[in-house]
């Protein structure tokens, strides 16, 4: 529905695609395809990834930019047709060497009081958000002097 609104109502360009040919999905799932695309980069530092992927940025969203380039996407991967249809929300996480997460992640706000008053968990607003949603957590672990490794 979002794609229809963006394309025909708002006149926005088409969403970028990760999978260039539908034939790819005959052999593997979308999730397996994503893992196959990014596993070649496991163990690389942010600087190595920036060099290899041609990224010249130190933006706060650097990890998201690196992930998009790993998947051959220009722009946000959350806006790709495949991620939208699959209901997958990508989240990049930086974990410090002491095991603590560097930044907090944003999630929709919800009312704890209202949640506690729901008859069942399945009727809650939070459940209706979490149940159909998949999260793709991409971890960058700090190793050494501020170097984050994928």
Residues covered by each model-derived region:
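Nucleic-acid endonuclease domains
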Residues: 1-150
């Amino acid at each position: 529905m979002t794609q229809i609104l963006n394309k025909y109502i708002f006149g926005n360009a088409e969403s970028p695609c990760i999978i260039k040919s539908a034939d790819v999905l005959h052999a593997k799932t979308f999730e397996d395809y994503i893992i196959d695309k990014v596993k070649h980069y496991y163990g690389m530092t942010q600087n190595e990834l920036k060099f290899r992927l041609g990224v010249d940025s130190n933006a706060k969203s650097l990890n998201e930019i690196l992930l998009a380039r790993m998947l051959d996407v220009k722009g946000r991967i959350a806006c790709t047709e495949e991620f939208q249809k699959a209901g997958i929300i990508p989240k990049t996480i930086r974990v410090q060497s002491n095991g603590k997460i560097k930044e907090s992640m944003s999630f929709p706000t919800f009312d704890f009081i209202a949640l506690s008053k729901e008859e069942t968990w399945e009727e809650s607003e939070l459940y209706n958000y979490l149940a159909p949603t998949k999260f793709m957590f991409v971890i960058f672990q700090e190793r050494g002097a501020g170097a984050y490794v994928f």
